[in-house]
Amino acid sequence: MEKYNREEFEEVIVDIGRVTKVVKGGRRFRFTALVVVGDKKGRVGFGFGKAKEVPDAMKKAVDDAFKNIVEVKLKGSTIPHDIEVKFNASRILLKPASEGTGVIAGGGARPVVELAGIKNILTKSLGSNNSANVVRATIKALSMLKG
């Protein structure tokens, strides 16, 4: 496992969820956090953390994200070719865009492509828009790009 300098990376919280367990004495809450980390130079990863408190869940998610970092092959400020990838019920379509287009992405795909360092891209989320699966599908697509 490669060690990364955490100062080079930015982190974005994509989703924080709350789960409630009802017990005799009342309700017990637990939290989940989905975090994307990237250095805007072609390295990006995501992590999932669960804990009884939000800050603990976020810390676990960031630690998990550094275990799942992938290298993205860029062509200038965009991607080399079109790609469509399916992860569970989520499908994501990524298309290269000309200079000046910007990042056209929504939901969980936007933080992934921005933190990967892509400046011009068109994305379309097809199928399920579950943010965790969209993030996973986007990272899977970026890792499958051929330079």
Curated annotation (Swiss-Prot):
Gene Ontology MF term list: rRNA binding; structural constituent of ribosome
InterPro entries reported for this sequence: Ribosomal_Su5_D2-typ_SF (IPR020568), Ribosomal_uS5 (IPR000851), Ribosomal_uS5_bac-type (IPR005712), Ribosomal_uS5_C (IPR005324), Ribosomal_uS5_N (IPR013810), Ribosomal_uS5_N_CS (IPR018192), Ribsml_uS5_D2-typ_fold_subgr (IPR014721)
GO CC, one annotated term: small ribosomal subunit
Pfam family, one: Ribosomal_S5
Any single biological process term in GO: translation
Domain of life: Bacteria
Keywords, in A-Z order: Ribonucleoprotein, Ribosomal protein, RNA-binding, rRNA-binding
Entry similarity comment: Belongs to the universal ribosomal protein uS5 family.
Role: With S4 and S12 plays an important role in translational accuracy.
Domain notes for this protein: The N-terminal domain interacts with the head of the 30S subunit; the C-terminal domain interacts with the body and contacts protein S4. The interaction surface between S4 and S5 is involved in control of translational fidelity.
This protein's name: Small ribosomal subunit protein uS5
Source organism (scientific name): Campylobacter fetus subsp. fetus (strain 82-40)
Lineage: Bacteria, Pseudomonadati, Campylobacterota, Epsilonproteobacteria, Campylobacterales
